[in-house]
Design a protein with these regions (language model features):
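Short, acidic/turn-prone active-site loops that include or flank metal/cofactor-
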Residues: 32-33, 57, 131-133, 200-202, ...
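N-terminal positively charged helical leader segments and presequences
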Residues: 1-89
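Glycine- and other small-residue-rich loops at beta-strand/loop junctions that grip anionic moieties
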Residues: 6, 30, 103-104, 129, ...
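RNA substrate-binding interface of SAM-dependent RNA methyltransferases
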Residues: 16-23, 34, 88-182
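Surface-exposed amphipathic alpha-helices with a cationic face
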Residues: 46, 163-167, 241
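Active-site/ligand-binding-proximal alpha/beta "capping" segment
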Residues: 174-228
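Structured adenosyl-cofactor binding patch, chiefly the S-adenosyl-L-methionine
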Residues: 15, 20, 142-147, 206-246
Length: 246
């Protein structure tokens, strides 16, 4: 069973939570749901960034014994922000923004560890996609050692569009990839910057790589082919810190 304080049960209750602007990580809906109220739910969901998964009712029953009516919403542990709101705010404050974007990272522990590093390095925000991404729940909060209480998290419909917006706003984009042209410490991290990290199995998607200004790699000197993504992120983040403080 999951902590019930992190969930909302029932179609009407979930509709009201969405309309009230609650930050919701995802919604599980039983596959064969067919009611007027469920149609209202899907209408309300249009235009939101909330991922919806259609699942067997048995899966929902394993999560809770409450009267869920085939619908369970998982409440986010953070209040999501929008990149397009945060960027002008940071520039108005005279900041030299540093963002970290996570492309396809779904492991809560990796996400929490990256968030912790970001907070320690004074990164201005972490950007994640609305779909195929981590669930920012209590486990993520715990793994981050509380960093997610203060670190802004932006959840975006399209990372590609967000990258284009950042480039138009004067950001340089650096991707960590095994296809990198040169080692990570040869890149320029001094200006407005977004570092993009991909999942360990797939890496940064091709569409997103195509928008990056620099592709960098971390040299592997042993027999293992790659680092854990949270470790790799930490290396690039602190290279940025070093260059910005020199």
């Amino acid at each position: 069973m999951v902590d019930n304080s992190e969930m909302i049960f029932g179609v009407r209750a979930v509709i009201e939570a969405i309309q009230a602007g609650k930050d919701i990580d995802k919604i599980l809906v039983k596959k064969d749901i067919q009611s007027d109220l469920s149609k209202e739910l899907f209408a309300v969901l249009k235009g939101t960034l909330i991922p919806v998964q259609r699942v067997p009712v048995e899966r929902i029953n394993r999560i809770t014994r409450k009267n869920h009516q085939g619908v369970v919403a998982f409440i986010s542990s953070v209040t999501y922000q929008k990149t397009e709101d945060l960027v002008p705010f940071l520039f108005e404050q005279g900041k030299n923004p540093l963002f970290v974007m996570l492309d396809g990272i779904t492991d809560v522990r990796n996400f929490g560890a990256i968030a912790r590093t970001c907070e320690c390095a004074a990164v201005d925000a972490v950007i994640i996609p609305a779909k195929n991404s981590v669930t920012v729940n209590a486990d993520a909060m715990k793994t981050s050692a509380g960093a997610l209480h203060t670190l802004p998290v932006c959840r975006e419909h399209s990372l590609k569009e967000t990258l284009q917006y950042l480039k138009n706003s004067g950001f340089r984009i650096v991707a960590a990839t095994e296809k990198g042209d040169y080692d990570y410490d040869k890149a320029d991290y001094t200006g407005p910057m977004c570092i993009i990290m991909g999942a360990e199995d797939k890496g940064v998607s091709y569409d997103n790589l195509a928008l990056c200004d620099e592709w960098v790699k971390i040299p592997m000197l042993g027999t293992i082919e790659s680092l854990n993504v949270s470790v790799a992120a930490g290396i690039l983040i602190y290279e940025a810190v070093k260059q910005r403080n020199n």
